Amino acid sequence: FRTSHEIQKIEKWDYADLKEMCNMDAVAAFRAHALNPEHPAMRGSHENGDVFFQHREACNTAYNELPAIVEKYMAKVNEKLGTNYDLFNYYGAEDAERVIVAMGSVNDVAEEVIDYLTAKGEKVGLVKVRLYRPWVSEAFLKVLPKTVKKVAVLDRTKEPGALGDPLYLDVATTLREAGLDTIVLTGGRYGL
């Protein structure tokens, strides 16, 4: 609701500041190749299941390279506009024992809660997810305070029949594979 119905002040980035970061010829070529009702074309109808499977697996290399590309452009945006975007951003006490992990519109509210609680001496923090897919466990663990004892993951989706919602499962897997089984992990949902 907040992202679709709320009126909020925003800072608009000047196109001139960002245009040098984008190859507009590549954008035009991409758009020319996109599906268009004025120039209809069929795609994907010429593969059997075995070939389709191979093509889906071949895409993995592109997905694996994506985080480095995103970080490169985040650094350019940060330098140009004075922002501080990373794959994951941490906000809160350096020695936090309780941390929220979330993405999207809830982060603004969570920051206010973190400010309120840290002012009262509580050791709390927030990990903001900026790039969700592909999930980069190493980058997540890098920003998670070493002092954390409890993590609450806030999802904004419902996966019927699943053991947990997507962000929760990614955090759970990351903590488990890093040997951080002693951290108490809780999942929650703040909307759909």
Question: Where are each of the predicted segments found?
Answer:
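Conformationally flexible catalytic loops at phosphate/diphosphate-handling active centers
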Residues: 1-90
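Short acidic, glycine/serine/threonine-rich loops at helix termini
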Residues: 2-12, 111-113, 138-139, 162-166
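Redox- and metal-dependent alpha/beta enzyme cores, enriched for Fe-S-associated oxidoreductases
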Residues: 94-122, 135-142
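Solvent-exposed alpha-helices and their adjacent loops that cap or buttress functional pockets
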Residues: 91-94, 143-145, 178-179
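A general structural motif
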Residues: 66-85, 102-110, 129-137
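Short beta->alpha junction loops
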Residues: 128-133, 187-191
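Peripheral docking tails and interdomain loops at the edges
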Residues: 150-192
